[in-house]
Every structure is written in structure tokens, then in C-alpha cells.
Amino acid sequence: MSQSSDFILNSTLSSVVERSTPDIAGFCSGYELRRHHHEHLANEGSLRCRTDWEQFIGPIERWGSCNPWEGHFGAVVLPFCKPERLAVICYIFEYAFLYDNVVESAAKSTLNLNTDNIALDETEYRTVRSILGTKQIQSKMLLELLSIDAPRAEVVINSWKEMISTTAKKDKTRAFNNLEEYVDYRIIDTGAPFVDMLMRFGMGIMLTQEEQKRIEPIVKPCYAALGLANDYFSFDIEWEEFQAESDKTTMTNAVWLFMQWENLNAEQAKRRVQEVTKQYEQQYLRNIADFAAGEGKENIKLQTYLKAQGYQVPGNVAWSLRCPRYHPWLCKEAASLLHQDTIQELEAGRKPQALEEYRSRSHSESDLSDASPTFWSGSCRSSARSSVSSAFGPPDKDISITPAILGDEHLLGPAEYISSLPSKGVREAFIDGLNVWLVLPDHRVNQLKSIAQTLHNASLMLDDIEDHSPLRRGRPSTHMIFGTEQTINSANFLLIDVMEKVRQLDDPRCMDIYLEEMRNLFIGQSFDLYWTRNGECPSEEQYLDMIRQKTGGLFRLLTRMMVQIAPVQQKGLETQLASLSDVLGEFFQVRDDYKNLTEEYTGQKGFCEDLDECKFSYPLIHALTSQPKNVQLRGILQQSRSAGGLDVPLKETVLSHLRQAGSIEYTEAKMGELMEKITDSVVSLEGETGSPNWVVRLLIHRLKV
């Protein structure tokens, strides 16, 4: 794979690594190896991740993606990554390498459900810290990706979600009958498609759905070669662990499988894996050549992408030759070399934040001895296997509703339907964010998420009936399928079911909180319904007060309950957190009003549906109060009440009046004001607690319009 002038890969970002043989340890014949000129940024990303890991999760127990000899994993696998994107991608690589055993083992710890409500025992604390820390780091990663390039970041996030949903269903102990079956499994297990999406993000490449379908069969041999090479180089350390653990009966490694399939010893099986890996490598080269000579002859974009993808193959092999992850006896020497390289970077004038933190730590808290591992010298002994997919666990499972004695299919049918519809997951993310400060055990967090989801679903079912709304999240509203009466019955049951869930929190004060906030919520809803039915336009302050009662009620309910049952009492934060909940509720509703007028949202819920429902939204209230003599606008709204809705031309006329009144800009300004309050509140809470909250920051970023 020599460089061709027909491609637009930026060769100034990396250099060819010269070698004396046409292959690399028997692999990669015909492949060119390159190393990124900005490798210090790759090391910076890894170092920053390790710093965050120690802060949010705990001591580092394993080696990551750095290699002082052949180069950082990201520097040799992604030699054409834009320099400004290399650090965050290598942060993600480092997280994936660190995650496998540390958080996995912590997640298997059993929570002591008999502990009191004042403090966590050690096992529970370590588990909660791992779960919270993982969410913090993942949120920080996503936030940085989104802030750099939101459209391509969304592609990465969607790939992440797909990987989670796919790998969660995979049986790690399954038996494989042949190589093809195993390769299909291993491609997903290693997270190769996800790494591919990270490469695209790094280069700023975006493929259409049609282009994605065209390249999938072309790149499959590349994915296969990457996974099998990983098996080859990681086998020795995995084999040692396998023999030491008597309870294991199988290995997810191609070398092991060839030992079983063909009755080979380990060395013979490794040679077989090398043979088939080389076959996949050469197949990928042929695929690229055939594409460039045939259907893709004029498609420089896809040729560039396929060429860049191919550089992962030699980069992965070269990195594997002496990476301490696969060769634990090299840990000490590698740590020393990386320490020297880091100091040289500082002396050369490159002083990013993480390197400064490294210098501070190396002068105080840690050294390079075995007794006190630095960022670089974590143990290499545990699970050397590289599996990006395992680093991103499946989403939390919701607590199911207890079946009724006489059968619950009619009672829960509407509830199950509304629960199956797409959801933004805002309230669940809000709980995760608050828990960074409150540190509730995971079973309590899941209980609160179940309360939030159940209560929200009940609210949606009743709201759609009261608003005469035919759509919910782009699908028919619940009452349009099950009928009004059955939907009301199901929603009412959910309110009772929530009371049972609150009771299970084992704190009587939580039931008081539930009743208080439910009363507030129903009062707020009563005003909304009254204004709509009687055509009485509220003032802006009245409307915002209604939002605080209604929309903010659920946020406030969750906040107060979390503070109440927090293992470390945080009563001093209750006022600040309640204020954050109120402002977030205001922003959420004003944002919803605004998005109801945009094409993106109306595709889900119906074009300007608020006008059909005769609801007074924030922009409409501004227009009516700022232009009290606008008889045309008032006439159209009266027509909506009489006719039960408006046709599209009349809705467009209303939008025109809103624009003329400056109501759209006024709403945007209000959202900006509320977002500033939210941000200030978060910064204040971070200062008060001493804990940065990347989960909340990511939530805020995703809510911005």
C-alpha cells in the first residue's frame, strides 16, 4: 500500500516508518506503516484519561495504549487524524484499555443491602465509585466529541449505542464451529466498527447511508485482520491467565480455537492464526484495488477512507510487538521511558494541562516504583485482551411492574406502550448527574430512575388526553390506541405504583416529598388546562410559575428524594439543587415550546401542535402581551378553538405574526438567560462540592438548541 497522488490523505501529519523487511513480524506484507507527528497529543489524551480515572474511579491497575518504542496506539493506527482531534480519540482508547477488568470486577461486587442509610460499606463504596466514575468519564468524552464536531460526534455516539446493544446480547462462553463464525463475532467483540467511526471523526469524514452499505463488504477483511492479529499477540498472556483460573473452560481467542478445531499445540495454532490473518490482510488490499479500478474509480472520498482504514492493520501489529499490555515484563522499562519523554515534552515548551498535572504528581504523590504506580506504570497482568466494546456497558435496566393477581395485560397495556416509545432520557440522565454529588448506591439510583420513568409515563398519558393530542414522539398517542378510559385507568394505576416504589426507599420523608410535589404538579396542570379551556392568556410570570409547579415538579421531586436518602447527608446542597431543578424545568418547557415551532420537532409531534391544542406557549404569550391590539392573531386563535384546530396556512400565518412581534427572538433570549443560570448553578455546585460534574455538563450540552 504505497502512497498515491490520487488520494487526499494528508501525508504531512505523519511519517513513513522505515523497516528492513517487507513485512512486520510475518504480518502486513505490502502495507506501509506510518507514525503521527503529533504523538505527544496522543500521549496527552491517554495521560488525561488516567488522571481522570484516578480522580473519579480509583487506582490504575493496568497498562493502556502507550508504547515508547513503536509508538502510541493512536499515533500508529490513526496516522492521518487531525491533530486537534487526536487527544480526545486517544482518551477514548485509553479508557477502553483501562476499563475491561477494573470496572468489570467492581460491578460484580455485591452491594450490602443491609447497610444503614448513613454510610456505604467498603465494597458498596467501591462499586458506586466505579459506576459514577464511569459515567463521569463517558460524559466527558461525549461532551468533548460534541464540542469539536457535533455531526460526526453523533455518528460516533450512534455507533457506540449500536455496539452496546449488540455486545450485550453476545454469549461470551459460546462455542464456535468454524473460523467464519468466530470472525463475525470477533469483529463486534473488538469494537472494530466503533474504532472505524473514531477514525472517521478524527479525519472529518462523513459517509452517507448509501456509501456505508457500499464499503461494508470491502472493509470486513480489514476488521477481521485486526481482530485476529489481536488474538495472536494477546494469546500468551491470556493463556497464562486461563491456565491459572480453574473455573474457566474456554477462551475467546482464535489461537485457542485452532488448538481445539485442529488438535494443535499453542505454537502451531499461532502459526495458523498468522496464516489466516495474512489472508485477510491481502484480501483487503485486493478489495481496495478492485474498488479503485472499478465502481469507485472516481470516488476519491471513499478511496481516501479505505486507504486510511488500511493503515490500522500495520499500526496495530507494530504496536503489539512490544506494548507492555501484551508483554508485562516491559512495564518498568516502558514506564521509565515514558516518564523521560513526558519531561522532555515539558522542557520543549509543550505544557498541556495533563502534562503539568503529571509533573506535579511526579514531584509529590507518586514515583516510578512498583509500590506506587504512576499514570504509566499500572499493572499489565490482568486481561491483556483488547476489546473496545467491553468498555461501554449496557444501559441500566428498569425495574418491572409487579403483575396484578387477576392478570395485568389490560391494566399495563397502555403503560407498556408509552414506555416503548422513543425517549430523550433527560430525567434519567439528570439522576445520574446529581448522583455525582450525592453518591447514592446503584440500587437506589435504579429505584429513582424507575420512579421517574413511571411517573413521567403516567403524566404523558394524561397530558395527551387532556390536550387532545393524537401524536406522542412521532407515534399515535396511547389513548388513540387503547381508548381514553383504559388509558386513564392505566395512568392512575402508575401513580399508585409510584407510591409503592417510593415506599421501598425506606424513608417516610420521601412519601411526604412525593405527595407535596404531586400536589404542586396537579396545581400547575390545573392552571394550564384552565387557560386553554377559557382562552385566557396568562402573563409571562404566571406562565413561568406554572412551569415551576408542573414541569419543574418532577425534577424537584427527584432532587429532594435523592438528597433525603443520600448516604452522606448533603442538606447544605438542598437549596442549590432545588434551584437548579426549578431553572432546568423552566428551560425544558420553554425549549419545548420553541421546538414545537421548528420543523425537526414537528416531524415528531405534529406541525405547530400547540396551536391545534389551543395552548398558550411562551412565544405566543409574548406576542399577545406585546401586541394587545393584534386582532388578526387573536381571531386565528379563536378560530382554532371553534374548529378544533388550524390548517397549515393559518398556522404559517401565526408563525409570521410571532416573527413580526419578535417573539421567536425573545424566546431564544429567554433560553439563553435560563441556560446561563443553569451553567452558573452547576459551576457553583462544583465549587461547593469540589467535584466537577461531566454528566450534568453533557446533559446541558445536549439540551442546548
Curated annotation (Swiss-Prot):
Organism ancestry: Eukaryota, Fungi, Dikarya, Ascomycota, Pezizomycotina
Assembly, per entry: Hexamer.
Protein residues bound to Mg(2+) 2: D100
Keyword annotations from UniProtKB, A to Z: Isoprene biosynthesis, Lyase, Magnesium, Metal-binding, Multifunctional enzyme, Repeat, Transferase
EC number: 4.2.3.218, 4.2.3.219, 2.5.1.29, 2.5.1.81
UniProt motif (NSE/DTE) ranges: 230-238
Residues noted as binding isopentenyl diphosphate in the record, renumbered to the chain: K424, R427, H456, R473
Region (Disordered) location: 349-374
Function: Bifunctional terpene synthase that converts dimethylallyl diphosphate (DMAPP) and isopentenyl diphosphate (IPP) into variediene as a single product. The C-terminal prenyltransferase (PT) domain of EvVS catalyzes formation of geranylgeranyl pyrophosphate (GGPP), whereas the N-terminal terpene cyclase (TC) domain catalyzes the cyclization of GGPP to variediene. The PT domain can also synthesize geranylfarnesyl pyrophosphate (GFPP) from the C5 isoprene units in vitro, while the TC domain is able to cyclize GFPP to the sesterterpene (2E)-alpha-cericerene.
Gene name of the record: EvVS
Motif DDXXD 2: where in chain: 463-467
Native organism: Emericella variicolor
Protein name in UniProt: Variediene synthase
Residues annotated for Mg(2+) 1 binding in this entry: D100
Record-level GO BP terms: alcohol biosynthetic process; mycotoxin biosynthetic process; terpenoid biosynthetic process
